[in-house]
Amino acid sequence: MANAFTYQILKDDTQHVVIKLTGKFDGSGQESNAVRIMANSFSGALATNGYPVANTQPGGVANTALSYYGLSLYRLWYDCSSSTTADVEMNWQATAPQTLFLLNGNGEYDGNGNWITIPNNTLGAAGANGNIGIFTRGMIANDSYTIIAEFRKHNEYYSRGQFRDPAAFNYSPYGLTPGGNNGLDH
């Protein structure tokens, strides 16, 4: 048996993405994956030209992904089954990665209650792109983890429907602007 890892998107809408990650270990080594969650792969991710990354521009030209995609950790449920003092580290990817969460045992974090969402603290740092990595320490044969993480997508990096229905978002040419710029002159 070899170490086995899974990645499953449970929900991906205009505001949130929920992802399930698992890892089962055979004792042959640790997980060291700097891009376990790729931020530009989610529904509505915008390209440098303002179109969705997944589509092509008029004329069939491929879109270029942004260099960074903003996510905030909204909720987290985890279970790390380990016979030693092993742990799982989730981090925000950058040249100098920043720890998002250290996981050991089981627990949850919920930014929906009195807690706040946890933003990516690598924004503006060298090599920051919004991706999330997973690294383990001390995992041996028959150890495992399950993580279910919900992230909030930041508006400036993901489409919320403003291109399909600009009037609903008060975007031009349907936007209402104070001072008469929209022809109402009041």
Where do the PLM segments sit?
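Short, intrinsically disordered N-terminal pre-domain segments
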Residues: 1-27, 182-186
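Short, surface-exposed beta-strand/loop "edge" segments at domain boundaries and coil↔beta transitions
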Residues: 24-34, 84-86, 98-99, 136-149
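Active-site-proximal loop/hinge segments that shape catalytic or ion-binding/gating pockets
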Residues: 36-38
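Beta-rich globular "head" domains
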Residues: 41-87
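Short, surface-exposed beta-strand/strand-loop-strand elements in extracellular ectodomains
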Residues: 82-105
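An anionic, turn-rich surface loop/hairpin at beta-sheet edges
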Residues: 98-120
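Noncatalytic modules at the cell exterior or secretory-pathway interfaces
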Residues: 117-146, 150-156
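Mixed-charge, glycine-accented linear interaction segment located at domain edges/termini
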Residues: 140-186
